[in-house]
């Protein structure tokens, strides 16, 4: 044997002359690569012309200039923190740099490996993966894929997967060391979502057990020093953005109605400012759709004196094809030499950092976003419209300077910016119900939650509440250990209450119906209520209405959808959201597969039986027994145990005010509403959830006195049945 030793090429080694292929590519117009650079190494097909066109644009991105430095740094370190301004190209390019390096290192081409890039939002995971598939000249779902809740668009051929942070957490439950992955990239880490924060702690442990795994943490803001400290002094790399100067304007006085002010500002910009697209930040779907209608109407009233506009909404539940419209060009002038056209994007804070839209010159920032808030004392989690942070305001204004100098109109005072806005967005883990998170951690084998390495540890009270809820649901025993029921619950991508409702539904002989209800609750609202046809929409909804509540109304809609062969025309005629129904059908099929895996029976009570709806309502109560409200003599509802005054949401389908209701959602607005409610009977509380309705630790209220009577009634019935048996 000879003594010559081959040098093992390490992951991310940079070639002796790394510029050589790039030079060749630039001079020959070929992509980076070796001899076969005309052939796409990922699918074996020749590159298309579009690939070369996109490649030229990719080379102009700031991150491209630091490719070698990035690969060298990552080669020498297990963890790397990368800060890149939005628009630097980090989300699309870094994962591609990584898969090329991993591919170069993997000599056995049959060995499967994967690079994962997490996104906090579904829209970003889908949109970015499509863009990267286009850049790599491959088919989405093949070499490049994405995975979001209830939708997996990947295959065994996938080498690069964009996925929501929540989906990577779910994968960790089945594969605690994430063995399939060679590199994991946590993108948009500055957003500090609940799932990202849990992944921080989890991956820190995984890295100790897997020296071959690499981690890249990417952020758009300079809170990176905190990430560095957390990841034991990992190196920090900064990529500049392509920011032009942005002029910032504040209002002189606080705006009473930010929506009207935003619309007014759009019209003024369109009338008075030079060409350039507009980005408006609003808080949610309803507000955005309302603004889009009003902008079209206001500009339409101006006639020929202004150019044409294209108003495009952007929010998470928008169909993917509609989401892609944000990348369409602005409309051409109506007549040659006439006023220029303008694109107006009206978006949630998803356009802050997750997606980059070229052509934006004007940004309108009302200073608000919807944020999750949680009060552990009364166990209420709700989405509230809240002021944004200074960091978010900075990100928003930066959207205006991507292609040329821009302007940002902040619809609040400079004093308010300086004095009222927090420096950073409060991490989600500090303002969320942690029941689902605790269940996930328990499934991952992490029992000591108090000492789990959270970057920002949640309040002990919030953790205690989560443990208490899971104990009542039977997911944890009295010692805090995961039960068999808890293990099954953790497999469902649902909140713990809904998972429990599904698991126990066979005991009530109604699992088919509970599957349909769960699927309907897991998708956007199926009822469409256009402003110009509200009366007709309300009449259509009333036809599906069930007098005993909203859950049963949703069941009626699902049954009618299936009976009408999932016909889109039927949906249109009945003011039903066809996409939501198709999603519900897809969700239901996935839930059926999980039920089958655990041998949970598919069954239904005979539709003609008087117990048909009773059994469904009892099964729902078995999951949602902690979300019950009682009608007091005063005419308002009190949440049971927490004694919060609440009102039935106006959208409910009940034709009466039941004494007891279960509710799906607690909505905090000017009044406290409970939404998606169903009538239940008081005695069921005693039958289905006696462990929770233990009167020894019950606050004094009317509901307690009623339940006391129900317990006494049950005792009498037991005594009588004993006597009868004798």
From Swiss-Prot:
Motif (DEAH box): 187-190
EC number annotated for this UniProt entry: 3.6.4.13
Keywords annotated in UniProt: ATP-binding, Helicase, Hydrolase, mRNA processing, mRNA splicing, Nucleotide-binding, Spliceosome
Top EC class of this enzyme: hydrolase
One matching Pfam family: HA2_N
Catalytic reaction annotation: ATP + H2O = ADP + phosphate + H(+)
Domain Helicase C-terminal: 265-445
GO molecular function: ATP binding; ATP hydrolysis activity; mRNA binding; RNA helicase activity
SUPFAM superfamilies: P-loop containing nucleoside triphosphate hydrolases
Chain residues that bind ATP: 84-91
Domain of life: Eukaryota
Entry's Gene Ontology BP terms: mRNA processing; RNA splicing
Stated role: May be involved in pre-mRNA splicing.
Annotated protein name in UniProt: Probable pre-mRNA-splicing factor ATP-dependent RNA helicase DEAH2
């Amino acid at each position: 044997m000879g003594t010559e030793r081959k040098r093992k090429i390490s992951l991310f080694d940079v070639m002796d002359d790394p510029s050589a292929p790039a030079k060749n590519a630039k001079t020959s117009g070929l992509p980076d690569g070796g001899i076969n650079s005309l052939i796409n190494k990922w699918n074996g097909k020749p590159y298309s012309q579009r690939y070369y066109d996109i490649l030229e644009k990719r080379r102009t991105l700031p991150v491209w200039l630091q490719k070698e430095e990035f690969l060298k740094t990552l080669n020498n370190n297990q963890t790397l923190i990368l800060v890149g301004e939005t628009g630097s190209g980090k989300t699309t390019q870094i994962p591609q740099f990584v898969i090329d390096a991993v591919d170069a290192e993997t000599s056995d081409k049959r060995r499967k490996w994967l690079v994962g890039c997490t996104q906090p939002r579904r829209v970003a995971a889908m949109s970015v993966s499509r863009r990267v598939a286009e850049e790599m000249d491959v088919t989405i779902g093949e070499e490049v894929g994405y995975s979001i809740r209830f939708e997996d668009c990947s295959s065994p051929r996938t080498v690069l997967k964009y996925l929501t942070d929540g989906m990577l957490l779910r994968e960790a439950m089945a594969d605690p060391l994430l063995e399939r992955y060679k590199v994991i990239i946590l993108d948009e880490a500055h957003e500090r979502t609940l799932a990202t924060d849990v992944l921080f702690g989890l991956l820190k442990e995984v890295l100790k057990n897997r020296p071959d795994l690499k981690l890249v943490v990417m952020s758009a803001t300079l809170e990176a020093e905190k990430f560095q400290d957390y990841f034991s002094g990992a190196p920090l790399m900064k990529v500049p953005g392509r920011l032009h100067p942005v002029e910032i304007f504040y209002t002189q006085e606080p705006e009473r109605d930010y929506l009207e002010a935003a619309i007014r500002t759009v019209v003024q910009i369109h009338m008075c400012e030079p060409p350039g697209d507009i980005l408006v930040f609003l808080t949610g779907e309803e507000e955005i759709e309302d603004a889009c209608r009003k902008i079209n109407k206001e500009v339409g009233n101006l006639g020929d004196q202004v150019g044409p506009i294209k108003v495009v909404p952007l929010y998470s539940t928008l169909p993917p094809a509609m989401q892609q419209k944000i990348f369409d060009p602005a409309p051409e002038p109506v007549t040659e030499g006439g006023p220029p056209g303008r694109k107006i994007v009206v978006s949630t804070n998803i356009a802050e950092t997750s997606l980059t839209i070229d052509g934006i010159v004007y940004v309108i920032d009302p200073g608000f976003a919807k944020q999750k808030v949680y009060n552990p004392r009364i166990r209420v989690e709700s989405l509230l419209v809240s002021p944004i942070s200074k960091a978010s305001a900075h990100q928003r204004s930066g959207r205006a300077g991507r292609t040329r100098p821009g302007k940002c109109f902040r619809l609040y005072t400079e004093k308010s910016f300086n004095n009222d806005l927090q420096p950073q967005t409060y991490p989600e883990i500090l303002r969320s119900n942690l029941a689902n998170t605790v269940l996930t951690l328990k499934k991952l084998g992490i029992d000591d939650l108090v000492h789990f390495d959270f970057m920002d540890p949640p309040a002990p009270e919030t953790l205690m509440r989560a443990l208490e809820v899971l104990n009542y649901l039977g997911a944890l025993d009295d010692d805090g250990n995961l039960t068999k029921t808890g293990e099954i619950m953790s497999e469902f991508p649902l909140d713990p209450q809904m998972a429990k409702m599904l698991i126990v539904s066979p005991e009530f002989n109604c699992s088919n119906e509970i599957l349909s209800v769960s699927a309907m609750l897991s998708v956007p609202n199926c009822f469409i209520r256009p402003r110009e046809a509200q009366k007709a929409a309300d009449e259509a909804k009333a036809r599906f209405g069930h007098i005993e509540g909203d859950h049963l109304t949703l069941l009626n809609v699902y049954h009618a959808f299936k009976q009408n062969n999932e016909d889109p025309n039927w949906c249109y005629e009945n003011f039903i959201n066809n996409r939501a129904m198709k999603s519900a059908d897809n969700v239901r099929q996935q839930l059926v597969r999980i039920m089958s895996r655990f041998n949970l029976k598919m069954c239904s009570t005979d539709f003609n039986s008087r117990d048909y709806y009773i059994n469904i309502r009892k099964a729902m109560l078995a999951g949602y027994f902690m979300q019950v409200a009682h009608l007091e003599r005063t005419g308002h509802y009190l949440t049971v145990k927490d004694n919060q005054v609440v009102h039935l949401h106006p959208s409910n389908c009940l034709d009466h005010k039941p004494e007891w209701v279960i509710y799906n959602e607690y909505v905090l607005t000017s009044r406290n509403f409970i939404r998606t409610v169903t009538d239940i009977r008081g005695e069921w509380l005693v039958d289905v959830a006696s462990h929770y309705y233990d009167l020894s630790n019950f606050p004094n209220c009317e509901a307690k006195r009623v339940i006391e009577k129900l317990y006494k009634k049950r005792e009498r019935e037991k005594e009588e049945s004993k006597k009868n048996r004798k």
